[in-house]
Amino acid sequence: MSEHEAPGLGIGMMATEAMGLLIEAVEQIPSDAWDQPSNLEGWSIRDLVAHTTGSAAKVVTLVEGGEVWQRPSQPDDWKCEDPAARLRELAARLQDALPGADLNAIRPSPQGEVPLRRALTFPVSDLALHSWDVYRSQGRLVELPEDLLGFCRALLESIPEDMLRRPGAFGSALPVPEEATPTARLMAYLGRTVDPDG
């Protein structure tokens, strides 16, 4: 099993599943909700989706072997008229590129030159986590699929606390009730409010 991969499910399948999860979340955004605040401070739902579209494009570009940018995707760079259609187009490109992808090919990443399977871990987890944010921004709490949840948790637990909490990354961990679900526990650990009334 490769680093941060869930048992029995490779990074390519993770990427496909996370992309599908994001598309499903975006397709459910009401037309009048796009400019409402998201659950992430300073971002509208439109900003959140645009940022995550950039992460989706990074996943596809890494698999295709193209040139990737080494900074977080800025919302203004990825806004478009039909975000769901753009994501579906990226998903189709991913499906075309995955069968021939060499997961051991070297790709650039924030950690330097690493195998493709490792370079994909951060942007794929970004898709999964922000899919949850899209739902949360509409007042809904959803559960991440168990395999993606385990994938994200393993990755995040491997990051030193000072790096995880640096500005622009994740907020301080928040308390959760005893009956909190596994997804709620992870999101609260990342500084997300998981109170259904919050």
Question: What do these predicted ranges mean?
Answer:
Residues 2-14, 18-21, 28-41, 61-79, ...:
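Structured surface interface patches that mediate subunit assembly and partner/cofactor docking
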Residues 51-54, 126:
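Short, residue-level hotspots on alpha-helical faces of the histone-fold
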